[in-house]
Amino acid sequence: MALIQTAFIWVAYAVAVGIVALIAAIFAYTYQTPRDRSALVSTITIITLTSLLATVLLLPVDIALVSSTTSSKLGAKKDWATPETVRNILLTLKIVYYALYSLDAVLCLLVIPFTYFFYEEYDEVDTEEGTQTLGQRLLGAAKYTLFFVVLVVILFLVGFFAPVARGGGSDMDLDYFKRLLAENHGERALTFALGLLISLGTLLYILYTSVGLALLPMSFIKSAPSISAPQLSETTASALEQNRERQRQLEGRNVGRNAGLSAKDQRELEALHREERTLVRRERLAAEARGEGKSFIVKAWTKTCAIFRPLKLVGGILLLLLSVIIWASMLITGIDKAKNSFCKQHCGYILGSINIFQPLNWVFVKSSIVFPIDYVLMALLVLFLFSSSVTGIAVIGLRFLWVRLFEIRKGHTSPQALLMATVMLTLIILAINYSIAMIIAPQYAIYGAQTFCTNPTRFPGDQPDCSNHPELIKTCSELSSGEGAEKVCTPTVVSTFLNRVTVNFPFFGALAFWAQFVFLAIFLIVFVTALFRTPKLDLSELDEDAEADEEEGLLATTGRRFGATWQDIRGKAKNQTPSRGAAGRGIRGDDDHDDD
């Protein structure tokens, strides 16, 4: 039975990793610009994001395996859960964690920089002329990557020799905290490196994830009030007819004149030609949005999406509620830790036990009794925070101070920007891993649903029996003491690893903890601002994208959607007569106003 349960947990994890690999592939394909698509960049991006998400999704596996050794109803270890069996489970988890964390660090600090410089070394002209070889590109990329190799070596040397906290005081004499003080120099180096990467990721996390967490639900609820495809087609056709009629008037007015068009008429005609090109592109966008020239399946899918698009509002409201619950849960845990942590900044504000009801932690603890309910919930939470981070990066962009270096947009992200965004997501996901385990669901992440029996034993070595005394069953926590707690309560590997970072290097723990309050403040500011801000349709951006795609012969293949209305479903525009002057001025204003 134990073997079947363990196998089921690992199979569920393998399925989850397969799903996140698919999500990573969709992310890389969706955001990378088609005309500069690189197979190497896409592959590295997919591998990196899969490894990172697999690291975070190992948390519920860790909890499920550790909790499976205990009967929460009796507060005792199961018969098959001998000390040797438990040690083997923890050793397996530790090996997987070390492998994933090491892979994450290597990908972030070495592989991605090498890929970035390798792509930058490519010169199309030199390659076609045969003056640039693959070996030259590899050598050039390796030369620039050498700096990062030196950085990694220095990082691990500092961690290898860095002094760790010894934690004076009675509070740190508990067995749980003694085990956290790493004596192995190799573990200490990896702990220091992880703590530094988490700290760097936390700085990005409080900026990008907080903004995305507030704006992602709003993007579902308050979509840009853009025109439907049929309405855009009709309005554009009317404006195009007016434009061409005006061109005919100008040309007819100057027929027979030896001097040709006057300077004023010539400027107006040139402006009309530019406007005409813009209107033609918009017509094509509207036609593709309606599925014209596509197969029956594509047209049916377009209309189906139009029918179900109002469900975005319901989904947005649910995501908004989830965002508020996450914010409230983080605030509750932060206040609880700041007030009731027995070691404060000396151990990164480790909380001995939950003193204030925390909704998300309660949901996860209760659902962990029946696997894989908690696993599904945790996977959804991780993907939501990941999507929020992507949204934040897309909104803010890749910046140095106030200067935007790269833009992250669907179908318009360069390979260099995609690699830089992947590095940022790498660091952010490490910070998300800390936040979930230490702030969002602290009790669940450390002990899951484990309990222990406080009933005295009948003789030394016997297991306490609470079958007739359920009131003596207590929840496991860091401060749990006594023979029953020592034998039954087994902390998860990830909590031990993260707490080891904060106990051995308290600065990292204090930084990660207080940064959560900055995260909450930024979320609140952006959330309140988004409530009162009305999104607007940026037609100039549509025109620029269409023009760029047209130059490459790739005119808007994704078919931008313009709002779920009855017009999209019927494929017809509303019967209305737009003002001639307003239509002409409105569209011309999107192009060049300076030429009039």
UniProtKB/Swiss-Prot annotation:
What is an example of a GO molecular function annotated in this UniProt entry?
Answer: cobalamin binding
Q: Where in the cell is it found?
A: Lysosome membrane
Q: Which residue ranges are recorded for the region named Disordered?
A: 566-596
Instruction: Please list the GO biological process terms of this entry.
Output: protein localization to vacuole
Q: Write out the transmembrane intervals.
A: 7-27, 46-66, 95-115, 145-165, 196-216, 313-333, 350-370, 376-396, 420-440, 507-527
Q: Which UniProt keywords apply?
A: Cobalamin, Cobalt, Lysosome, Membrane, Transmembrane, Transmembrane helix, Transport
Give any Gene Ontology cellular component.
vacuolar membrane
- Biased amino acid composition, Basic and acidic residues: 587-596
One matching Pfam family = LMBR1
The protein's topology relative to the membrane is: Multi-pass membrane protein
Q: Does the keyword Transmembrane helix apply?
A: yes
Q: What does this protein do?
A: Probable lysosomal cobalamin transporter. Required to export cobalamin from lysosomes allowing its conversion to cofactors.
Q: Which family does it belong to?
A: Belongs to the LIMR family. LMBRD1 subfamily.
Protein name according to UniProt: Probable lysosomal cobalamin transporter
The protein's organism comes out as Sclerotinia sclerotiorum (strain ATCC 18683 / 1980 / Ss-1) (White mold)
